[in-house]
Amino acid sequence: DRYYRWSNANIHRGVHVLAEEATMLYEDARRNVAGFIGARDAREIIFTRNTTEAINLVAYSWGRANLQAGDVIILTEMEHHSNLVPWQMLAQERQVRLEFIPVTDDGLLDMEEYQKLLMLAPKLVAFTQMSNVLGTINPAGEIIRLAHDAGAITLVDGAQSVPHIPVN
């Protein structure tokens, strides 16, 4: 309510008082989010409208610039469509190969199979930290460490986890 009454202006676009106030509030929010999730620098925070838009942004910017035919992306079988469809579209466009970490009967990721998939030298491992369907909390630290050891970068869909568990 306060913003709409007293600071309603475009951010980063004006030198008048309302624009400067709106920009200050926006950048304060960026710093608050960075602190909340343990980011090293507030400049690491990019605001998007939602998870789908954020992952599409990565897929169509980083993905198009860095992936080519035959490259491998590892996902999990428990992904929400926001972390599945962009990679499927990119795979079709670029002839990139998608591989999936299976889910065990008790709703956990099969980490032994994950380690086998890493032998395919993936460029990217993209996974949900907390499944919105199963409620499973995946071992993000271990998944990331193993991916980095294999030379892959990681994308963590933290939309479900950030409000519920500490992240960094």
Protein language model features and the residues they cover:
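Pyridoxal 5′-phosphate
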Residues: D1-N168
